[in-house]
């Protein structure tokens, strides 16, 4: 391991959503009807950018406490033109003096608009309806190779959203040849997306969503992990989140660890679940990147569940790193 440790967080084909609009309505509207929204929020989205935003907070809190500067996160994704206002808003959304390096992004100079997602949330039922639009061409395998040139040779970690499984598989297989010491994590989230299970066999760490697991008729996080562990790469860690029931992890030795989101008798007020899975991933990556040996696997899992639980109790991601680490300092995480 090099000191300072330089770890590249990289993702292929992340859907950037700097103009993600979240509209709250009294109830879901009927077709061809008019309804006044109760509220409107506009913020940057995208699975991996969300994860990086929370990871950046955790790293900053840790740096402030220990003066450590061993992790350097990168984002590799497709953005509109360098001069497009939307591109500037994406980068600015990470804050002044961001730890995230955007120099490896791919800019589509012919585009001015980012991918966008519009979320309609019903106050009556809590349901969320998403409408996506993306005119940006997806990243190709050759573009990924060019964008990540020269980044190998360190203690590296690549995280993929798993948007285009066939291309993602090419990228991971190329990494195994060109940078065999690199670790790879993959998110298996969207139900019905062909090719995701093939990625499980290639990754060191896999994150399964509850919606994907239920689409495969698994009744619990543990059942999903038991079934998928037979397909996984040897020595891998598999994680599956399950909403209010917390999450579970299958370890390289085959053991399964579970962690509830709340203690017995506890209740929380759920305000905003958008990005909770991305937040959980940030917590796990932080555990591996910054506390691989000082935290055991149960502590890593408990911490990630706690960060995600903090997230669903607020709008957006502000101060999640501070809140989660402060609770850990009070002895509220781990076993």
Annotate each language-model stretch with its function:
Residues 1-19, 64-71, 78, 92-264, ...:
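Ribokinase/PfkB-type carbohydrate-kinase core domain
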Residues 1-74, 86, 130, 155, ...:
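Glycine-rich phosphate/adenosyl-contacting loop at the front of the ribokinase-like
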Residues 38, 160, 186-187, 270, ...:
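Thr-Gly-centered strand-to-loop micro-motif
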Residues 46-50, 86, 113, 279, ...:
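Conserved active-site and cofactor/substrate-binding residues in soluble primary-metabolism enzymes
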Residues 50-55, 270-297:
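Short, small-residue alpha-helix embedded
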Residues 78-84:
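Acidic, glycine-rich active-site loops and adjacent beta-strand->loop/helix elements
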Residues 311-312:
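Conserved short C-terminal alpha-helix that flanks the catalytic cleft of nucleotide-sugar-dependent
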């Amino acid at each position: 391991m090099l000191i300072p440790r330089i770890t590249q967080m990289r993702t292929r084909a992340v859907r950037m959503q700097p103009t993600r609009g979240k509209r709250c309505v009294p109830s879901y509207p009927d077709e061809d009807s008019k309804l006044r929204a109760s509220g409107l929020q506009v913020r940057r989205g995208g699975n991996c950018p969300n994860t990086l935003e929370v990871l950046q907070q955790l790293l900053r809190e840790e740096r402030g406490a220990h003066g450590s500067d061993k992790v350097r996160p990168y984002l590799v994704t497709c953005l509109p033109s360098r001069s497009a206002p939307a591109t500037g808003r994406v980068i600015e959304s990470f804050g002044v003096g961001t730890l995230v390096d955007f120099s490896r992004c791919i800019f589509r100079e012919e585009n001015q608009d980012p991918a966008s997602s519009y979320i309609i949330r019903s106050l009556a039922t809590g349901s969320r309806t998403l409408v996506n639009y993306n005119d940006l061409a997806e990243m190709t395998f050759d573009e990924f190779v060019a964008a990540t040139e020269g980044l190998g040779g360190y203690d590296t970690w690549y995280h993929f959203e798993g948007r285009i499984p066939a291309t993602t598989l090419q990228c991971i297989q190329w990494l195994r040849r060109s940078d065999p010491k690199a670790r790879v994590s993959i998110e298996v989230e969207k139900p019905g997306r062909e090719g995701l299970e093939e990625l499980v066999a290639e990754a060191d760490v896999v994150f399964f969503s509850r919606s994907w697991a239920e689409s495969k008729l698994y009744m619990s996080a543990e059942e999903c992990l038991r079934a998928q562990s037979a397909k996984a790469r040897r020595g891998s860690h598999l994680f599956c989140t399950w909403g209010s029931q917390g999450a579970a992890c299958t370890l390289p030795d085959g053991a399964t660890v579970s962690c509830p989101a709340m203690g017995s008798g506890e209740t929380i007020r759920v305000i905003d679940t958008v990005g909770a899975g991305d937040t959980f991933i940030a917590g796990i990556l932080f555990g591996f990147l910054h506390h691989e040996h000082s935290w055991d696997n149960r502590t890593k899992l408990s911490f990630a569940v706690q960060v995600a639980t903090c997230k669903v109790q607020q709008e957006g991601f502000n101060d999640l790193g501070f809140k989660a680490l402060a609770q850990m300092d009070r002895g509220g995480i781990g076993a």
